């Protein structure tokens, strides 16, 4: 099923990647032979974007042809919502530097803005949507064309309904889900099934943003 979304692989091909540190990624890269990861997953925190920029300028040289997948956190160190501060322009300088770095990277970048937004009490839905649009409008005005946005939820029992957090088809390129338990992969697990149905309704491809057996490294089997 193709939706002709930004950076969507053709002919039902699947791109796989790994993270969450350069060391872990390098170990995984060296451990697999025929199917090297095409994507490197990393995190950026809005209050500490400068640190991410400095790190990424070094790490991107290690794998120059890699696709980036970035989880952009809009929370402070205590887990408090920073969407109002973003909307007030407090982090404009940091975000400008962030997008400038991405633009210079040139390779495709998948940006999971406010990933796992549906955790109960994490974000105010209206402010989340406004902040999402603010961030997207900012990088588009800067002429950054190598970003695809990923609306990434963790739709489990007990999380918030996702629909009130949707910024609109114009602002979302991909849907994304984070999965960590085997039961979440069951066809009988309604929250994820409904999320996937929503993706089809909006004609968006789906990315698995994060997934691994809890507390078990890939190299250990």
Language model regions located:
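Surface-exposed substrate-engagement region within the catalytic domains
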Residues: 1-37, 41-62, 141-221
